[in-house]
């Protein structure tokens, strides 16, 4: 039976100052703007592409980098972010493209600042166009960065976010991250059990190379403290799902699992039937999703969770790669707090 803690173990969260959230949000927006240009080039989005189009994009890339320095954001951007913006157009490395996973963190920060009205379900993304519109920042224009950040710099500026609402959204992020990590462990439990049996032999022989399952756990940011739970996941997931539903952390269950709303494609022959069918959704259990969809939800959960963790200073520095060091933001994950 999974461990359950009382709500007395909760802590009162205090957000970082609004200007810190605004500065971090601005850094994310500049690099995500560059990410959009690089991703389009990588995917070969050409159309009626001309030499003038390439020149225009090169100028846009250079303008984004200048905006970072002229607005003073270079003092708040990470070294990795500055390095990405300084690279010439179409010279990004493979790992740079993973920055696209930060859209959801960008959305959470804007929600905390009151620029987004709600956080979408954890199987849906924030609307990216609305996120850019929410700040009013034109990535190549440093003055728009200042216009967004300056109102939050005043000493009397405070977030008006209700503390109970903040607590709820943190709890929701923890629940979905726990479920995403549980799915990774569920898929690897046999490999992990075998590795556990072989560990004494490896220690005796001095052989300690990373196994394929260990590589997956590392790249998918699974904390070491959770890995020993893999054997019990088939029994633990239904218990966690019921807990999450009863506490309002998920909207519904399907098959004793977190319910994922999936849109059904219509096969109607007439316009009325097709239109009606196109808007139909159904719930499926999380475990029944294919691996690509499960991975997409894991990335959404990780990104949002880390944004909350940083915003309440659970994470001291902005480095999403360290999310594997965090099991929860609360002292005990919200899934297991009564």
Spell out what each predicted region is.
Residues 2-338:
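Extended, charge-rich alpha-helical interface modules
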């Amino acid at each position: 039976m999974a461990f359950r803690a009382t709500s007395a173990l909760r802590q009162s969260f205090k957000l970082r100052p609004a200007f810190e959230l605004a500065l971090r949000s601005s850094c994310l927006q500049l690099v995500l703007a560059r990410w959009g240009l690089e991703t389009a080039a990588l995917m070969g989005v050409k159309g009626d592409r001309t030499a003038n189009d390439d020149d225009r994009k090169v100028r846009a890339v250079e303008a984004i980098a200048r905006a970072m320095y002229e607005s003073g954001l270079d003092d708040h951007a990470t070294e990795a972010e500055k390095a990405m913006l300084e690279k010439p157009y179409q010279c990004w490395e493979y790992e740079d493209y993973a920055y696209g996973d930060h859209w959801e963190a960008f959305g959470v920060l804007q929600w905390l600042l009151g620029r987004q009205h709600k956080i979408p379900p954890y199987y849906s993304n924030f609307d990216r166009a609305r996120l850019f519109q929410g700040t009013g920042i034109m990535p190549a224009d440093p003055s728009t960065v200042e216009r967004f950040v300056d109102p939050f710099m005043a000493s009397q500026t405070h977030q008006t976010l209700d503390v109970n609402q903040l607590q709820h959204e943190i709890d929701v992020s923890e629940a979905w991250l726990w479920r995403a990590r549980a799915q990774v462990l569920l898929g690897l439990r046999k490999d992990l059990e075998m590795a556990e049996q072989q560990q004494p032999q490896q220690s005796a022989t001095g052989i300690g190379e990373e196994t394929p399952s260990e590589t997956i756990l590392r790249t998918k940011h699974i904390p070491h403290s959770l890995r020993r739970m893999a054997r019990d996941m088939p029994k633990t997931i239904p218990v966690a799902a019921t807990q999450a539903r009863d506490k309002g952390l998920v909207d519904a269950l399907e098959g004793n699992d977190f319910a994922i709303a999936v849109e059904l494609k219509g096969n109607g022959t007439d316009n009325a039937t097709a239109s009606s069918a196109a808007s139909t959704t159904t719930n499926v259990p999380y475990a029944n999703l294919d691996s690509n969809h499960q991975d997409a939800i894991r990335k959404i959960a990780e990104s949002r969770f880390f944004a909350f963790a940083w915003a309440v200073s659970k994470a001291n520095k902005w480095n999403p790669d360290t999310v594997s060091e965090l099991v929860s933001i609360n002292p005990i994950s919200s899934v297991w707090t009564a």
